[in-house]
Design a protein with these regions (language model features):
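Short helix-loop-beta junction
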Residues: 111-120
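An N-terminal, well-structured beta->alpha segment
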Residues: 12, 17-112
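Short, Lys/Arg-enriched N-terminal segments with co-localized hydrophobic residues
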Residues: 1-11
């Protein structure tokens, strides 16, 4: 929860959850997951109150729907942020993207690859 400038608590994570719930999601697996947590404020808060952090080992988190979960939308956002940063460094626009045997690793690599290609 975040306090606004008048000290009132804002439940912005609920707004973000509703936005995802109403969206025409490309990853159809996430819709039933979102519907299942409807009304569960603790679960919605855990998934939507913060963004998944990009650390020294990259993105790591629980698979699922939300800004604090591993999914194609979070991968796209992180890829765009990284691509924007690389451009500011004046470096090469060549990147290497790979995947391993973890669940959905290949899908996330392809998502990142398409996103990076579009940033060229």
């Amino acid at each position: 929860m975040v306090k606004n400038n008048k000290g009132k608590v804002c439940n912005m994570y609920q707004d973000e959850y509703k936005r995802w719930l109403a969206a025409d999601l490309e990853d159809a697996d996430l819709k039933p997951e979102l519907a299942k947590i409807e009304g569960n404020d603790d679960e919605i808060k855990d998934r939507f109150a913060v963004a998944l952090k990009f650390g020294t080992a990259g993105l790591r988190g629980v698979l699922g729907a939300g800004t604090n979960r591993m999914n194609i939308y979070v991968v796209r956002q992180a890829t765009q942020g990284l691509a924007n940063w690389v451009k500011t460094q004046g470096g090469s626009q060549t990147v290497a993207i790979s995947y391993d045997s973890r669940l959905k690793s290949d899908i996330f690599a392809k998502t990142a690859s398409r996103c990076a290609f579009m940033m060229r």
